[in-house]
Amino acid sequence: MARITVETLIKNVVDKLRASRTAAISSVVQNGNEYTLNTLKTFDIEKGNFISVLGFSVYVVEVVENVSIKVETSNDLTTAVEWEALQPYFYYGDPIDMNNEITAGSNDQDTKYPAVIMFEVKRSKYSIQRSDLIDFTPRLRLFFMDQANYSDSTINDLYKTVDSMQDLAEEFINQLGITPHIYVQDSDYNLNKHSKWGVKVIRSSRQQSETLFDNNLTGVEIEIDVPIAKSLQFSCLC
């Protein structure tokens, strides 16, 4: 049996966050290419996000909290009874490869954020005791990021996004805590806030560097040890 990888585990947790952002549509009002979806739950969806309706990715133009979501699309949504969030997105790997994935095939990168970004796992602690329930404990660095307008935003504006991403990080930790075969209930984690975040790499010399990720990003970083039980390798991620 193939081992379940850490990135598969974390992707599953992020999928649960996305699945929790699904709600019924009580009625639909059409006005040309705009559709007002009356719904009792809007969660953290904002203008500029994309949501899924009838399998179509549609652009959000207005949100009235827990009342309605207005979207723009050329597709017919008049029969819609449910909407689903497309966020948060999940990216894993080294920064260069992730940036290439995010920017590939789309000029509209609003569809790619907010996101949970996980760097490659470099360090794990393994148990050699046969009686130990824990298989190994990877140390994870996760970034919860959304786009921000650096040039026109005040520090207070940026920290509204930081606070929103901290809420998402805490939601992630809570979901991780109820994931079978994971033992983080008694763990601590470090959290760093980034009003302006980027990853710098050295290109041709130590005097020259380049910031990766082609978007202005704001959010939080967490570092946490995640004890994973041996039983996970004989189970499904359900």
What annotation goes with each model-predicted range?
Residues N33-T36, V67-K70, F136-P138, T218-I222:
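Short beta-strand micro-motifs in enzyme catalytic cores
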Residues T22-N33, L40-I45, S52-I102:
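Small/polar beta-strand repeat architecture
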Residues M1-T22, K125-D135, V184-C238:
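Short, charged interaction patches at domain edges and termini
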Residues T73, F144-Q147, I224-I228:
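Short beta-strand-to-loop capping motifs
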Residues T5, L9, D157-L168, F172:
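Short amphipathic alpha-helical segments
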